[in-house]
Amino acid sequence: MAVDTSGTRISANGKSADLSVRISEGPKYSLGAITFAGHPGMERKELIEALALKDRAPFTPYAVDEMQRTLRSFYRSKGFFNAKIEVLADRTRARDGSVPVTFVCEPGPRFRIGSVVARGTDRLSPAFMEKRFESLTGKTYDPATLETRYREMIKTGLFKTLHVRPVQDGPDTLKLDVEIEEAKAKEIGFELGYGTYDGVSAGVRVGDRNFLRNGRPLSLSLQYSQRGFRGELLYVDPWIFDSEWMLRAKIYSALRDEIGYSKTTEGLRLGLSRKFTPHWEAGAYVVGETTDISALKIDSRLVGPTSYVLTAAGLMQTFDYRNDVSNPTRGWVLMTSADLDALDGRLAFARATVRYSWYRAFGKSLLGLGARAGWIIPIGDAEVPIDLRFFNGGSTTVRSFSEMKLGPKDAKGNPLGGEFYTVLNAEWDFPIKGALGGAVFTDAGNLRGSSDVSLDDMRYGVGVGLRYQLPIGPVRIDYGYNPARKAGDSSGAFHLSFGFAF
């Protein structure tokens, strides 16, 4: 290509100019035959696939440089840390506009991770960082695996800065030079909110992300709402016994006033989980809990056990392909769980739940679809306590009903819950101005007994809402209209809540 600006003319007063630009495009070149010279050490097909070239792709100096970088990164991903790639491309050798390109590949030795050296630890135990990268030692160098481990460490919140540099430490060995600056480990946080069902709420959380200098978080949280009080002590070990498994141990106590009764609960929950892939997490849990139900406004014959000990064990798994956990704009998540309580003959049941959510952005608008179901199966003559039953209706289920108001009720209108439920949601969110957005939605769901599992007696809701976007999720105001009211139903319900409905 040639550019000619000789036609430029300056005005008589010298304050302006007429600029004439003549462009001669010249011949058009495309990428021609690709060859590999030197000592590639890999099959040609594998190298071509790594380049991911399109047919008759344009030939430009930038395109050639990008191909060189891509090939070098590919070799490094296979452990060839010092791979050298030279490009030979000469337009004078072009035939019919196609320029042949030769890559001279000298991968060198395949490197493995050797030692890990951490610098900058203060409150953290010096061995902490070495143990976090220990599983990589002795293995072939892989930048992607190293990046994943780096991101895992950043998410702990333990570091103000973290740099991980592979440094050659022998003919085929790399040393990981880890340089850190620790963040403040101790924290205190406060929260204040309001929800349609819980009313005004407030809370305080005190935590130490570096408990006993081992990088494990311990926190105490106290929460109050107009429905009651809850205290919780939580210990998390993301690497129990320095493995890939995570332990969550929680001790809690709560006092709540529900519709038709009050309850006090003390319990312990232990959960063990592991991420087997970046998108699949699975685990198991056990729960021990004592509960006392009091201040009954419901006939005791409809409530089930009012004082019991829950001892349950269960399995869970999550497939999460969302692009953002708190504010997704694409992807889907599937969560399932199943547990069993059969140690106490008065309280014996099996329970299973499933939840699926899908998100897709269309420009600045967002379509969300959701489906949920749960089933509790009593064992023998056991009754399910009212507080362990499923409920439906509210800000995250069928929004044409107030909280827990969909389903069986006693003569006074108190919800009784059920052993099988479904919820289906569809919502379209759209921008209005700035952080303010709107929504239209439709919901459906039902609530039935354990022996009457079906999609009969579905209840529906259609509605509109407002959304105010925050970095951690939206504040929601919704009104759901009931298009098929039955005796005792209200025409609809307002909801004020935080986060996504499903």
List each model region and its residues.
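Outer-membrane beta-barrel "beta-signal"
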Residues: 206, 314-315, 464-470, 474-475, ...
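Residues that define the transmembrane beta-barrel architecture of outer-membrane proteins
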Residues: 67, 198-200, 227-229, 262-266, ...
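Periplasmic polypeptide-binding modules associated with outer-membrane biogenesis and secretion
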Residues: 1-196, 205, 219-237, 263, ...
